């Protein structure tokens, strides 16, 4: 569990961001760190919300920025603490987030660390937990890996989900691309018929 001394030890910006977290969010991180240290499961009693998502995302960004500095003040012990807190924070976000922006942050982080197992885990979370509109947003990302993970997830979506997205002026073209992939890669006749009907309507 991070004591105030430990957090202060990690740098001024980290201490500031930590102090700005709601007590409930700080408690979530503390319990996750304790669970990681003891090998136990964390409690699910905390009501995770969009604000906790944003707070943890900012905290993780501060931790990763500090780790990237590699200054003389960052000795081996402090670096180890920094990595432990950052990895724990990333794990909590990975388990809880449904935000496209946070997902992209986690993928970029795993990519920089060459942690391909974590990227696979994130891809699984994308298909099992994220709303279709968030996946579409990721499919338009400038990050190649994020974009490909999202397009792959959409290509495995049920036709009914993609059909609903066709009514959204922002997501419609992304949904069409997913339907085309279903035709080409999976030989989906249902997707083929839907695309043909769309083409007929537009003639």
Locations of the language-model features?
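Alpha-helical repeat scaffolds
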Residues: 106, 192-195
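Fungi-biased detector of serine/threonine-rich
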Residues: 64-65
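Structural detector for internal amphipathic alpha-helices that build alpha-solenoid repeat scaffolds
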Residues: 16-20, 31-34, 41-61, 73-98, ...
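N-terminal "cap/leader" segments of large eukaryotic alpha-helical scaffolds
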Residues: 2-35
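C-terminal end-of-chain micro-motif
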Residues: 1-2, 202-203
